[in-house]
């Protein structure tokens, strides 16, 4: 039992040493390099009671760079010596611990007892020194903290005093726009505003302490309630008023050279007969001011008018509360109409950020803004871009003016396409001369044959006009070339509806498109022809029947039996002079005079190509807008509907007007049968009012004329095609000439 107790006694001092070394090492916050190497060499201690030694191993590995102190090294020596003892004891005990008898314990006891006794004096001294020294360090640090705490209590007050003095100094107020903006008319700043400054809050948040410090500052003035503070007015300048500039400086200075007066710094003339005398301090200025008012009183026979002026802060103290400075007035002297506001940029054609011109409001500028197509095409909401292309929205300067080649995506591209093309015919002469603008195959190819050419070979095609011609319809992308119509990246939306919409447009503008190229405008001398130029031809009725059977089969299908045409032949001959008498009043009927002029005799046949050429030239020069021509032809129908005797004559005039000029290259073939053409058309037209309705003769004459002249004699057109044209014309109401 005694041996076991002795072994426990030996193990306990070793454990205490290790534990004290561990604590001392923690107190110094410094790792011991030797500890790591030696603790790694310790074998596992499963049978030793002092197993707490292994707890140092993970802590030793975490420690960083070695920082050695004298106390740490001495403690480390003691701890390492204790560890060496323990390691030696375990190494000696290792083979003996396996014995079954108690000799091993006795040997270990004999070997272990002397070592602690021998190592105790040196090791325990080192271990005793370590903790005692380490314990003194926190005491010193605590005393140091206690000693510095009163300093910190005094320092914040002094630092706060200096900081507040600087914040409210004239040097800082000259540049601190925030404090200036918080000043009232008396230059008072709320103390709470000063206390909320960052560098003041770091020092103290006690408002009472800040007010106390501010009251102790000589350069600032706190109001009676302790709520506001302002810098002291440095009243050190005495102002003398109503002293002329011509007064010598010496005389003014002599006023302040008394024995009881302080010395002034400067004496100078200011403005408006005011003199400034500057003193060093406010007390000196007050003393001089009192001297002048009480003792001198007069100067140059006048009472002295003296004031004390505060030294101005180098700022404008009447700024608005928001802290913004007013602009320099000198800017307006150089730039009279310059504005101080900032507008969002409106991108002109020279700038490359165009999309914002749609988003920003309209600025009615002279130069149109434009859209860059590469920037418009990826725009996700293309309906927003087309939001400005409503037919009812017509801005004065549209941002989509130059988008003629690059229109954005539209649900019905042909809608905007035709909106520009068709109405511009009313403004631009000859726009409809080229049928290729409208890709209408039914109009361009009549029965497989191209419609007669309506312009000179050298005449330029007036398709793309000046953008100013589209000023009324700037809301849409505009007409596009056929090539760019297909290659344009943005024209993909709703192509399926384009053909159906085009057919509707075809119905609306068929008459204007087909009639406008055909009616010629002969020269003005043709208006002066009398009735004698068109005598009735007696033998025309017999020859007419065979010609109409071959050339006017379309008319015979609609009109009916040829008997009625034969019966009305004489009546048409009789009404012809009446028709001609009204000719000069109708612009569209002017061509009939030229046609009748060469009808009576074959002697005029050699001149027919020249006359036709002349008519074509005047047709290209004197062409009116298509709407005017259409109304002229429709006025013929309206007037014809009024009186039944005149109606065939006006319809015949309109038919002859539409037939003769386009077929001028083919006219010599037709003129081989003289004296038959003029009356034949009359006979055919006279029977129409009784058989058919009154309006379609103008349309029937217009598209049917080239078809009858260009078709071979035996051909017969399909009745459904012609009936379709007539049904379309019914939907177009007649217009008055005015």
UniProtKB/Swiss-Prot annotation:
Domain annotation RRM: ranges: 240-307
Compositional bias ranges of the Basic residues kind: 493-503
Q: Which GO terms describe its biological process?
A: positive regulation of 3'-UTR-mediated mRNA stabilization; positive regulation of translation
UniProt entry tagged with the keyword Lipoprotein: no
Q: Where is the composition biased (Polar residues)?
A: 138-151, 450-468, 628-640, 729-738
Which intervals hold domain HTH La-type RNA-binding? Answer: 150-239
Q: Which GO terms describe its molecular function?
A: mRNA 3'-UTR binding; RNA binding
SMART domains attached here? LA
Sites of Phosphoserine modification? 244, 424, 434, 451, 488, 498, 524, 556, 568, 601, 664, 718, 727, 736
Renumbered residue ranges of the record's region Disordered: 1-52, 90-157, 399-420, 449-540, 591-738
State any GO CC term.
cytoplasmic stress granule
Query: Which residues are annotated as modified residue Phosphothreonine in the UniProt record?
Result: 518, 566, 732
Provide the positions where the record notes the PTM Omega-N-methylarginine. Answer: 404, 419, 493
* UniProt-listed Pfam families: La
Q: Which residues carry this modification: N6-acetyllysine?
A: 724
Question: Can you say where in the cell this protein is located?
Answer: Cytoplasm, Cytosol
Biased amino acid composition, Basic and acidic residues? 605-622, 680-697
Assembly, in brief, is:
Interacts with PABPC1. Interacts with RACK1. Associates with polysomes via the 40S ribosomal subunit.
Protein function: Stimulates mRNA translation.
UniProt name for this protein: La-related protein 4B
Provide the species name: Homo sapiens (Human)
Q: What is the lineage of its organism?
A: Eukaryota, Metazoa, Chordata, Craniata, Vertebrata
